[in-house]
């Protein structure tokens, strides 16, 4: 998997109360990912980008809501989230994401 595809697959971390509790108790990190990304692509992207061992990947797709903008009816985009379980004792620091992006550009 090339570096460009890694950054297409992983869109960013999810910051929520549930994600924080899972990260602290079960060693699970939550990421927003590309809607077409497969579990294998997500696993390889996290392992390569953060240098950790991934045990399993669970994904969910949240359908976008219909919203009104004045007279027009719009729709929010669907979002795919990946719950990535890491090997015991390993953790992903979100500061690592910025460091890796800078080193990949060099």
Curated annotation (Swiss-Prot):
GO terms for cellular component: ribonucleoprotein complex; ribosome. GO terms for biological process: translation. Keywords: Ribonucleoprotein, Ribosomal protein, RNA-binding, rRNA-binding. One of its GO terms (molecular function) is structural constituent of ribosome. InterPro entries: Nucleotide-bd_a/b_plait_sf, Ribosomal_uL23-like, Ribosomal_uL23/eL15/eS24_sf. PANTHER family: 60S RIBOSOMAL PROTEIN L23A. Belongs to the universal ribosomal protein uL23 family. One of the early assembly proteins it binds 23S rRNA. One of the proteins that surrounds the polypeptide exit tunnel on the outside of the ribosome. Forms the main docking site for trigger factor binding to the ribosome. Part of the 50S ribosomal subunit. Contacts protein L29, and trigger factor when it is bound to the ribosome. NCBIfam families: PRK05738.1-3 (NF004359), PRK05738.2-4 (NF004363). HAMAP family: Ribosomal_uL23_B. This is Large ribosomal subunit protein uL23. It comes from Acinetobacter baylyi (strain ATCC 33305 / BD413 / ADP1). The gene is rplW.
């Amino acid at each position: 998997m090339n570096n460009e595809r890694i950054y297409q697959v992983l869109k960013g971390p999810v910051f929520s109360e549930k994600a924080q509790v899972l990260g602290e108790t079960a060693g699970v990190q939550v990421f927003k990912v590309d809607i077409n990304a497969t579990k294998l692509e997500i696993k390889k992207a996290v392992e390569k980008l953060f240098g950790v061992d991934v045990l399993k990947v669970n994904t969910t797709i949240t359908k976008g809501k219909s919203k009104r903008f004045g007279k027009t009816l719009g729709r929010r985009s669907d979002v795919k989230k990946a719950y990535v379980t890491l090997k015991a004792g390993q953790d992903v620091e979100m500061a690592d994401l910025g460091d890796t992006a800078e080193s990949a550009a060099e």
